[in-house]
């Protein structure tokens, strides 16, 4: 899964500090993140302070510490939409002259190592672009993808909590913890994390999978049934309710599988397996799903990457307890 980045180590301990020259900086506007990209292979890497500052020095006054990976700090700069294209133009002006560290290229991932060797010798083969969360899904290596999408999640939270929901005053960063505090009434806002369940429903040797409607999600692949926990519910009650609402089925033997921080939707996903209880006729919730059906193990497609708990659950059903290992063998 996207958070499984070992041997790399993610540390979300709160600090107040300024970025060093080689620290990573995420510039974000409208949930789009500024990344460096190789022209030919489209390998995405994260800019560092020195190159951002060389082109747009005033941005560094807005830098906020986020977290570290392997003791390397990552920072956030919120960018107003009206400034986005100007910033991009200034960065592009200097891309052919700007030194880019070898370490930054090395971290781009094993798949693109050949392309990056050329990029080190010819910096003009690099460009900058505003990328979406969908682009981050394919980003290598995994620890950089995890860092990028976590930064987007924290940006969304900060953007939505600029003013106090109780009295309307402008919020300020806490000096002691990752929180936004109202200086007038003391209201404290923490990062948004919404609990949600995702359930693999089995019917003998078949698994229920669905597809979202185009207007409901950007994800076009096969998905498991999922939904947010409502007030006053246990996770197991949420499983039963969501399954009934989305596909009109009853389930039993609900068993916990794994959990996952899913920054793409500000959620903590709690994965369960459950067995069909009774009639297998699907009654589709058409405003959310475009289709749903029962699939044998042979009919379940292999996803390109195991970044989500839902995908891991599908591979667990398809290949057994060693699902991830067998999935990797099939990718070779």
Regions found by a protein language model. Give the residues of each.
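The catalytic Nudix box helix
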Residues: 223-258, 272
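Active-site-adjacent beta-strand/loop module that shapes the phosphate/pyrophosphate-binding cleft
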Residues: 260-283
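Active-site proximal loops enriched in glycine and acidic residues that flank catalytic Cys/His/Asp
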Residues: 211-212, 226, 255-260, 276, ...
């Amino acid at each position: 899964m996207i958070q499984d980045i070992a041997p790399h180590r993610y540390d979300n301990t709160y600090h107040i500090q300024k970025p060093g020259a080689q620290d990573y900086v995420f510039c974000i506007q409208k949930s789009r993140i500024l990344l460096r990209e190789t022209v030919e292979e489209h390998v995405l890497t994260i800019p560092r302070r020195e190159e951002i500052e060389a082109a747009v020095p005033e941005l560094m006054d807005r830098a906020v510490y986020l977290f570290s990976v392997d003791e390397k700090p990552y920072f956030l700069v919120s960018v107003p939409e009206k400034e986005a294209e100007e910033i991009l133009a200034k960065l592009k002006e200097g891309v052919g002259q700007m030194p880019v560290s070898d370490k930054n290229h090395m971290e781009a991932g094993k798949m693109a190592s050949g392309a990056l060797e050329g990029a080190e010798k010819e910096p003009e083969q690099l460009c900058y672009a505003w990328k979406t969360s969908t682009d981050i899904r394919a980003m290598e290596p995994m620890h950089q993808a995890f860092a990028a999408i976590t930064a987007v999640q924290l940006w969304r939270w900060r953007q939505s909590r600029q003013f106090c929901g109780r009295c309307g005053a402008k919020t300020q960063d806490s000096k002691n913890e990752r929180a936004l505090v109202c200086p007038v009434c003391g209201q404290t806002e923490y990062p948004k994390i919404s609990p949600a369940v995702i359930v693999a429903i089995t019917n003998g040797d078949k698994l229920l999978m669905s597809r979202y409607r185009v207007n409901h999600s950007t994800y076009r692949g096969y998905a498991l049934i999922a939904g947010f926990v409502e007030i006053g519910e246990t996770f197991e009650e949420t499983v039963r309710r969501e399954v009934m609402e989305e596909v009109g089925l009853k389930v039993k033997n609900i068993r916990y599988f794994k959990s996952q921080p899913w920054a793409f939707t500000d959620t903590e996903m709690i994965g369960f397996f459950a067995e069909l209880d009774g009639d297998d006729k699907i009654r589709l919730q058409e405003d959310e799903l475009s289709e749903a059906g029962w699939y044998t193990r042979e009919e379940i497609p292999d996803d390109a990457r195991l970044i989500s708990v839902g995908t891991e659950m599908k591979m667990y059903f398809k290949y057994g307890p060693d699902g991830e290992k067998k999935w990797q063998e099939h990718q070779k």
